[in-house]
């Protein structure tokens, strides 16, 4: 009560913020008339002057009114579009690093040109992030006319570009692209071997379109680049064959809310019998446990045509938020293979993670981040807590006159679908266009089938038909059109009303089910009533819908029984609607906690990732790596000889002596580097009563490095860089796998009264320290086993040109080392499959002789 009185007197926080921007608005409008008289060349020349001033230290805020006024004028001249005052306010909010909540049809695409042009003057680059390649291309071309008029360069990052094209796009003042392309380019840059191969610049300023979709909906899906692992796929089929013989609730239980499945004690015994195992929980059977759980999820939780479809004998993921197909993306942890086995298609090899990052941590790297969406207010707390972003509600240019009708609730799904079809037929007969929103392909096809029987013409837009998306969306506002769309397919394209449609009541939005998130429901409503157009929305629900069945509790069903509902009769009751909204709030809270927990765990990995990528970048950029290599040498020798220091002059016991000797041999190949130390076996112990001194070992290894430097000539620096980066990448890849295993089992620590997050942090740090140490040692294991033939040493002078050519070829190979073979990409939602990049050089088998020339098998030498 008191809060509402205070709000009436002083206005809300949002109102006060908008009021504080009035002085900017007055200045911009005051400049409009004067700038309208300037020739085209004078405007671009003035922008060039302002760019120079900014790079000399002038603040962006001080020139904001003038730049915004020039962008407005550019819009009028090249597009015939003038930025409204409310769009100016949205632009100021974006420049200030906030989220601008703007209703559908209010011109978010045009708003972004204001802060983009202003911040481009810093010369550090502005990234405009969209949800798919189509929008990235469209906006870059469409809005690019404004930027080009102002003398600013524009690039676009879409799937299929080579590194040179990407580098040019990132070098532009303003770069459009999808969240996935930006994220994957960052990961790929951190797998490159030479600074000339990098494509991205440092992360300066990003404007994220549909920010709720990217930073909230996709926050749980990390971007992953992976390569093939050695694990066999036969086990997936073997386990899949036993799942139909297990009975739900007897042999296994399913938690639909948590989307998890688990074997019961009886189920464990049955699985052991069917698989011929003595003990499923024996450590050697750990892979069986993992495969059984994934197969149970594949059969009992994941549904065909809802979570995925089978297309061209492949399992293709359907994005739960947009309804789009995600070709080239795969579920992780063997779940995708379990689905392939379930559907009887080819089971692809499981992949091992080479690099990964969540969108949460990727976007937090930007110095300044802002975003636009039509629906952010319900997630304002999460934006504030996770990203430190404030949501500003921007008023509409024209009043909203759309009618949002109360939900119609039925007892059963068949009753609901019959009512939906009757309502669609009524509206079609009237001539009012209808957009039917469904949350699965299955539902969209069910309604389409019912409409076909009733003779109602319609278009279906779901993951299976998304190639026709633009054409179908363009027609959706025409009189008499019926369009069935899975979720928010077609988002980003406004539905324009046809002639005479406003008089019929505008676009009618019919929701067939409530989504777990109120925001997704609001997005569907937002397709109607754009720019002051009339419109109407209504949701049709049933007690058998997943949301009400899982989260609505029995109170709603009891309430509806007391109200005495008859078959086929709907109810429109505020108490029921409120109960449904509370169910959605509970699910939203649950999903927020999941995302927060994911971030807590990923923050541990993120800190480690930052250290590794920084070390990698320094190694790539450094011209002289010899000091780093010698520093590694000092650290290793000090560590190896530490037990000797601790004895304080006393004789070493035999076990410690043998351990030091073995480590010297393993790390430095000392029997080659320091021939006097030719430890062949335990009988050799008597011949070497004393270990070589630390100084002697250091001198011997440094001597080896000097010889390597002479033999390698000008490519010595490339050799050091190659091995430093190669060993860093190999150890990081193994560390990612170890961290995955740690994460999988860490939840069990809670049963021992220990905090799983703290345990993960502590053990993760220990693993990371071990990995850093392993990098140092593995670099020397590789370098001391490397054999190079000097050109001058060729036996036949006639062979010298060939030897020289070989050395030149090796240098070129080192300078242009490719990324790992057969990379796979997963995470996020993007149109178009990722084509795996392949290495042309033959892969070295684990039992082949090591190419370094040591004479050992690869798996016992550089592949160890």
UniProtKB/Swiss-Prot annotation:
Q: Where in the cell is it found?
A: Cell inner membrane; Cytoplasm
Is the Coiled coil keyword given for this protein?
no
Task: Please list the cofactors this protein needs.
Answer: Zn(2+)
* Enzyme Commission number, as recorded: 7.4.2.8
Kindly give the PROSITE patterns that the UniProt entry links to this protein. Answer: SECA, SECA_MOTOR_DEAD
**Top-level EC class as recorded in UniProt:** translocase
Report residues binding ATP: 87, 105-109, 494
Topology relative to the membrane, per the entry?
A: Peripheral membrane protein
Bias (Basic and acidic residues) occurs at 810-820
Q: Alphabetically list the UniProt keywords.
A: ATP-binding, Cell inner membrane, Cell membrane, Cytoplasm, Membrane, Metal-binding, Nucleotide-binding, Protein transport, Translocase, Translocation, Transport, Zinc
Annotated Pfam families: P-loop_SecA (PF21090), SEC-C (PF02810), SecA_DEAD (PF07517), SecA_PP_bind (PF01043), SecA_SW (PF07516)
Q: What is its main location?
A: membrane
Gene Ontology BP term (one): intracellular protein transmembrane transport
Note on how the cofactor is bound:
May bind 1 zinc ion per subunit.
Location of region: Disordered: 809-864
> Where on this chain does Zn(2+) bind?
850, 852, 861-862
The UniProt family comment states: Belongs to the SecA family.
Say what the protein does: Part of the Sec protein translocase complex. Interacts with the SecYEG preprotein conducting channel. Has a central role in coupling the hydrolysis of ATP to the transfer of proteins into and across the cell membrane, serving as an ATP-driven molecular motor driving the stepwise translocation of polypeptide chains across the membrane.
Q: What is the protein's name according to its record?
A: Protein translocase subunit SecA
């Amino acid at each position: 009560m008191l809060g509402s009185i205070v709000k009436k007197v002083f206005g809300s926080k949002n109102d006060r913020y908008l009021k504080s921007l009035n002085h900017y608005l007055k200045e911009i409008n005051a400049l409009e008339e004067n700038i309208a008289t300037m020739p085209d060349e004078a405007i671009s020349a003035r922008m060039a002057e302002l760019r120079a001033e900014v790079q000399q230290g002038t603040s962006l805020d001080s020139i904001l009114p003038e730049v915004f006024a020039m962008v407005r004028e550019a819009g009028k001249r090249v597009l015939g579009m003038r930025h409204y005052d409310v769009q100016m306010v949205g632009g100021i909010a974006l420049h200030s690093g906030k989220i601008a909540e703007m209703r559908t049809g209010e011109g978010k695409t045009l708003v972004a040109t204001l802060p983009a042009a202003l911040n481009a003057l810093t010369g550090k680059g502005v990234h405009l992030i969209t949800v798919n390649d189509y929008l990235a291309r469209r906006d870059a071309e469409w809005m690019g006319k404004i930027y080009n008029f102002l003398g600013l360069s524009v690039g676009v990052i879409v799937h299929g570009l080579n590194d040179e094209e990407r580098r040019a796009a990132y070098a532009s003042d303003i770069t459009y692209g999808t969240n996935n392309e930006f994220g994957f380019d960052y990961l790929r840059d951190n797998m490159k071997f030479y600074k000339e191969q990098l494509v991205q610049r440092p992360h300066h300023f990003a404007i994220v379109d549909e920010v709720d979709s990217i930073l909230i909906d996709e926050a749980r899906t990390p971007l992953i680049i992976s390569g093939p692992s050695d694990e066999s796929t036969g086990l997936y089929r073997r386990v899949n064959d036993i799942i139909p013989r297990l009975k739900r609730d007897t042999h296994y239980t399913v938690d639909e809310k948590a989307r998890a499945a688990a074997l019961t004690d009886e189920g464990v015994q049955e699985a052991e019998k069917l698989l011929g195992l003595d003990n499923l929980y024996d450590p050697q059977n750990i892979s069986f446990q993992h495969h059984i759980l994934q197969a149970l999820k594949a059969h009992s939780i994941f549904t065909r045509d809802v979570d995925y479809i089978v297309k061209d004998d492949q399992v293709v993921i359907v994005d739960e938020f947009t309804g789009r197909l995600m070709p080239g993306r795969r579920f992780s942890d063997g779940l995708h293979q379990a689905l392939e086995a379930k559907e009887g298609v080819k089971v692809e090899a499981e992949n091992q993670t080479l690099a990964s990052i969540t969108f949460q941590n990727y976007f937090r790297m930007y110095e300044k981040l802002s975003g636009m969406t039509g629906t952010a207010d319900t997630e304002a707390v999460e934006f504030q807590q996770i990203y430190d972003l404030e949501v500003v509600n921007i008023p509409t240019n024209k009043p909203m006159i759309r009618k949002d009708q109360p939900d119609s609730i039925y007892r059963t799904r068949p009753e609901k679908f019959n009512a939906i079809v009757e309502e669609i037929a009524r509206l079609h007969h009237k001539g009012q266009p209808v957009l039917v929103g469904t949350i699965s392909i299955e539902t969209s096809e069910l309604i389409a089938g019912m409409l076909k029987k009733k003779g109602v013409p319609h278009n279906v837009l779901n993951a299976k038909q998304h190639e026709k998306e633009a054409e179908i969306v363009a027609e959706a506002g025409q009189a008499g059109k019926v369009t069935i769309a899975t979720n928010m397919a077609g988002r980003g394209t406004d539905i324009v009303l046809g002639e005479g449609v406003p008089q019929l009541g505008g676009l009618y939005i019919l929701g067939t089910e409530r989504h777990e998130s109120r925001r997704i429901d609001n997005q569907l409503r937002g397709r109607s009533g754009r720019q002051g157009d009339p419109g109407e929305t209504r949701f049709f629900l049933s007690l058998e819908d997943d949301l009400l069945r899982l989260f609505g509790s029995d109170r709603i069903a009891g309430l509806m029984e007391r109200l005495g509902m008859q078959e086929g009769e709907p109810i429109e009751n505020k108490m029921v609607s409120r109960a449904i909204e509370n169910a959605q709030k509970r699910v939203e809270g649950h999903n927020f906690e999941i995302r927060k927990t994911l971030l807590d765990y990923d923050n541990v990995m993120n800190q480690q990732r930052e250290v590794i990528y920084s070390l990698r970048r320094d190694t790539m950029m450094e011209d002289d790596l010899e000091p780093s290599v010698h520093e590694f040498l000092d650290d290793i020798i000090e560590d190896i000889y530490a037990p000797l220091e601790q004895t304080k002059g006393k004789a070493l016991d035999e076990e410690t002596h043998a351990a030091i000797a073995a480590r010297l041999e393993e790390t430095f190949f000392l029997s080659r580097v320091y021939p006097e130390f030719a430890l062949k076996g335990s009988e050799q112990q008597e011949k070497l009563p004393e270990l070589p001194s630390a100084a002697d070992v250091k001198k011997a290894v440094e001597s080896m490095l000097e010889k390597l430097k002479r033999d390698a000539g000008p490519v010595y620096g490339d050799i050091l860089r190659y091995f430093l980066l190669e060993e860093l990448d190999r150890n990081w890849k193994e560390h990612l796998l170890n961290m995955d295993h740690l994460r999988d089992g860490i939840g069990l620590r809670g049963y021992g009264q220990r905090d799983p997050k703290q345990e993960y942090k502590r053990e993760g740090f220990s693993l990371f320290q071990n990995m850093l140490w392993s990098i140092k040692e593995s670099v020397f294991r590789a370098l001391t086993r490397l054999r190079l033939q000097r050109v001058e040493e060729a036996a036949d002078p006639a062979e010298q040109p060939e030897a020289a050519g070989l050395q030149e070829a090796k240098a070129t190979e080192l300078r242009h080392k490719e990324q790992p073979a057969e990379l796979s990409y997963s995470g996020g939602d993007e149109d178009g499959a990722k084509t795996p990049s392949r290495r042309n050089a033959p892969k070295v088998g684990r039992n082949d002789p090591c190419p370094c020339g040591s004479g050992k098998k690869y798996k016992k030498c550089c592949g160890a």
